[in-house]
A protein has these predicted regions:
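A conserved beta-strand-loop-helix scaffold within acyl/acetyltransferase catalytic domains
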Residues: 1-50, 54-67, 116-255
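Alpha-helix C-terminal capping segments
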Residues: 5-6, 11-20, 98-106, 270, ...
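Aromatic (often tryptophan-rich) hydrophobic motifs at membrane interfaces
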Residues: 46-48, 56-57, 79, 91-101, ...
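Active-site/acyl-donor-binding loops of N-acyltransferases
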Residues: 57, 61, 123-147, 273-339
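Conserved acyl-donor/pantetheine-binding loop and adjacent beta-alpha core of acyl/acetyltransferases
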Residues: 60-81, 310
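A gly/proline- and charged-residue-enriched helix-loop-helix capping module
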Residues: 75-117
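Short catalytic-loop micro-motif centered on adjacent basic/acidic residues
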Residues: 113, 171, 276-279
C-alpha cells in the first residue's frame, strides 16, 4: 500500500462519509474544529493498493518547539481517535506502514501518533510503535431501551426516576449561549477537586460553531422545575458511534440527579438514529453504574529520533503539573475573596 496526500480543495468529503467505519472525529467539520483550536493543518490521504483506492487517512500536522508532528489524534485535542477508513478486506497494519513512510518522507514529521477504533494491538507492535490505549467504557445501543435501562444498577435507575419526579427536564440546545452555560458548570465541577478545566471556553465555542449545524452533535440542557439550567452535556455522534464528550452540572443541584437523566436521554436519542455504540468518553469508575463495559482502543506513537519521544513525555508531565498549579491558584484566590 501507498499513502498519497489529497489536496484540501479536491477532497471528496461525501465519498469519505460513506465509509462504514467512519466516525464523527474524521469528518470535515471536526478536523476544522481541531485545526482552529490547536493551530494544526488537516491532512487527508488516499490509501492505494496498486491502482485501487482502498481507503483514506485523516489527521493533522502541527509544529511545536521546531518539531513537526502528525496526530490522528493527539493528547489534549479532546478527540479520542481518528485513524483510517478502509474498504472491507483492507489491512490496517499495512495501511499503518504506508502512513509511517508518508509521515517521515513526504510530510517531514519527526513524531507521529495514531489511534483508530479498529486497530488491534499487534498492528502497531509489529511495526515498532510504542503502544498505549484510549481506555473507556461502551454501551451497546443495539439492545432494546428496556434492556439498556435494566442493565443499569438499581441505584442509577432510582436516580433517573428521581430526576423525572423532581421535575427535571432535558432539552436540546441550538443557541450560542449554550457554550457559556456549559463552561460555567464545568468550572464548578473542577473546583470540587481544586482543579481547573483542561480546556478553555473558546474550545467549546469552536466545537459548537463547527459541529452544531451538521446535526452530528447533541447539545443538551437539564432544567429544574423552576426552569433553571442546572446541568448540560455535549455528545457528538455519527454512523455507528456516539461519544460522551463532556457533561457538567452545578454542585448545588446534583441532588436532583440531572446527570443520570441526561445520559439516559442521550443513549435513547442516538439509538433512535441508528447508532450502535455509546462510548463513555474515557475512564471513571462512576460510569459503571450505567451498565457499560470496559473498552480500549490502541494508541500508537513513534518518533523518528529518540530525543523527540522524550520531549513528548516531558511535555505531558509539564501539562499535568500546570493543571494542578492552576487549580491551587484558583482555590487560593477564591479563599482570599471569601475572606
Amino acid at each position: 500500500m501507498k499513502c498519497r496526500i489529497v489536496a484540501p480543495e479536491v477532497v471528496d468529503w461525501e465519498r469519505l462519509d460513506r465509509f462504514e467505519d467512519r466516525t464523527v472525529f474524521q469528518t470535515r467539520e471536526w478536523l476544522q474544529f481541531v485545526s482552529e483550536t490547536q493551530d494544526a493543518s488537516p491532512v487527508v490521504a488516499e490509501i492505494r493498493e496498486g491502482n485501487e483506492i482502498v481507503g483514506y487517512f485523516s489527521g493533522l500536522t502541527f509544529t511545536r518547539f521546531g518539531v513537526k508532528v502528525l496526530g490522528s489524534s493527539f493528547p489534549g485535542w479532546t478527540t479520542p481517535y481518528m485513524g483510517f477508513n478502509l474498504i472491507p478486506g483492507a489491512t490496517r497494519s499495512v495501511a499503518l506502514a504506508a502512513l509511517e513512510e508518508m509521515a517521515w518522507e513526504e510530510l517531514n514529521c519527526l513524531h507521529m501518533e495514531v489511534s483508530d477504533p479498529h486497530f488491534a494491538v499487534e498492528d502497531g507492535q509489529a511495526l515498532g510503535f510504542t503502544t498505549s490505549a484510549y481506555v473507556s467504557y461502551r454501551t451497546d445501543l443495539r439492545k432494546s431501551e428496556a434492556e439498556i435501562f435494566d442493565g443499569m444498577d438499581s441505584a442509577c435507575r432510582r436516580c433517573v426516576r428521581k430526576a423525572e419526579k423532581s421535575g427535571v427536564v432535558i432539552e436540546e440546545a441550538h443557541d450560542p449561549a449554550f457554550a457559556d452555560e456549559y463552561y460555567e458548570q464545568l468550572k464548578d465541577v473542577f473546583a470540587k477537586q481544586d482543579l481547573v478545566p483542561t480546556y478553555d471556553l473558546d474550545r467549546v465555542k469552536s466545537l459548537v460553531k463547527h459541529m452544531e449545524p451538521t446535526g452530528r452533535i447533541l447539545l443538551v440542557r437539564a432544567r429544574d422545575g423552576e426552569g433553571n439550567c442546572i446541568a448540560s452535556g455535549i455528545f457528538p455522534g455519527y454512523n455507528k458511534i456516539a461519544e460522551f464528550w463532556g457533561n457538567a452540572s452545578f454542585r448545588s443541584s446534583q441532588i436532583l440527579r440531572p446527570n443520570e437523566l441526561i445520559h439516559w436521554y442521550v443513549m435513547r436519542y442516538w439509538k433512535q438514529r441508528g447508532v450502535e455504540v455509546y462510548d463513555w468518553g474515557g475512564e471513571g469508575t462512576y460510569k459503571e453504574k450505567y451498565g457499560c463495559v470496559p473498552h480500549s482502543v490502541p494508541w500508537f506513537t513513534k518518533s523518528r529520533y529518540q530525543f523527540v519521544s522524550k520531549l513528548r513525555d516531558e511535555a505531558k508531565k509539564m501539562f499535568e503539573r500546570k493543571q494542578k498549579f492552576m487549580g491551587w491558584l484558583q482555590t487560593t484566590r477564591n479563599a482570599s475573596t471569601r475572606g
